[in-house]
From Swiss-Prot:
Co-factor: note: Binds 1 Mg(2+) ion per subunit.
Subunit structure, as described in the record: Homodecamer; pentamer of dimers.
Coiled coil: none
Pathway: Cofactor biosynthesis; (R)-pantothenate biosynthesis; (R)-pantoate from 3-methyl-2-oxobutanoate: step 1/2
Pfam families membership: Pantoate_transf (PF02548)
Protein encoded by which gene: panB
Domain of life the protein comes from: Bacteria
Organism of this sequence: Legionella pneumophila (strain Paris)
Protein name as it appears in the record: 3-methyl-2-oxobutanoate hydroxymethyltransferase
Length: 262
């Protein structure tokens, strides 16, 4: 998938599929699938490193995981999150951070928020030829300011703010916008108001595409079960079953067998 395919898919009313990915083996699997695009999300701090929030993601962490995913990925378009405070200092520092992610293999960056400074930064990056994906609604990097993980845009004032933010991000040059944890009617209204595509997570079926976290949709963990996640596989259960089978065969001397020995 190429950058121009995002807008084309919206025009042709073809849904966009996006999935997070954090390592080389997973990227190799994704490469053999029909997934359109991959996000090396700052959720890696939680899903892989065990931190309680995405705020703990660093530019070094994002760079390392982007390199790993890029080595294994195929035709999918690769986007990487600019981590917490990665664009809140000088524009020069922001460009340097983005440069590191692009050199690591990212084809675009995703930036959370739509305040004046953020939109100016996005415009600066886009004018420099760097594709940027926006992100509104529940923005995990602002979790403390938002008062926790909860649905955004539930009242008319918040809804109007999100509509304005989406329009501002489009004007700033974003090629797509993630809408997270927003009522489905509002997400559909935002989607219909934009020329660029929207990617939803917890935003209903009316967005131009969907994104889920690898570990959530494959059932690799069972402690985090938000309403918007559908588990397409019970990986954790199958992994435990395989591990216990290995232990049993070792204890009963069924492994290694002759075919596993020299």
């Amino acid at each position: 998938m190429k950058i121009h395919d995002f807008k084309m898919k919206k025009q042709e009313q073809k849904k966009i599929s996006m999935l997070t990915c954090y390592d080389y083996p997973s990227a190799c699997i994704v490469a053999e699938s029909n997934i359109d695009c991959v996000l090396v999300g700052d959720s890696v701090a939680m899903a892989v490193h065990g931190h309680p929030t995405t705020i703990m993601a660093t530019i070094e962490m994002m760079e390392l995981h982007t390199q790993a995913v890029a080595r294994g990925l195929g035709k999918q378009f690769l986007i990487t999150d600019l981590p917490f405070l990665g664009h809140k200092s000088s524009q020069g520092h922001t460009v340097e951070n983005v440069k590191r992610l692009l050199q690591a293999g990212a084809q675009a960056v995703k930036i959370e928020g739509a305040d004046k400074d953020t939109c100016q930064t996005i415009s600066h990056l886009v004018n420099a030829g760097i594709p940027v994906m926006g992100h509104i609604g529940l923005t995990p990097q602002s979790i403390h300011q938002l008062g926790g993980y909860k649905v955004q845009g539930k009242n008319s004032e918040q809804a109007e703010t999100l509509l304005q933010q989406a329009a501002t991000l489009e004007q700033a040059g974003c090629f797509a916008v993630v809408i997270e944890c927003v009522p489905q009617d509002l997400a559909k209204t935002i989607t219909d108001s934009l020329v660029i595509p929207t990617i939803g997570i917890g935003a209903g079926p009316g967005t131009d595409g969907q994104v889920l976290v690898w570990h959530d949709m494959l059932g690799l963990q069972t402690s985090f079960n938000p309403k918007f996640v559908k588990k397409y596989f019970r990986a954790k259960d199958h992994f435990i079953e395989a591990l216990n089978s290995y232990v049993q065969q070792v204890q009963q001397m069924h492994f290694p067998a002759n075919e596993h020995s020299f």
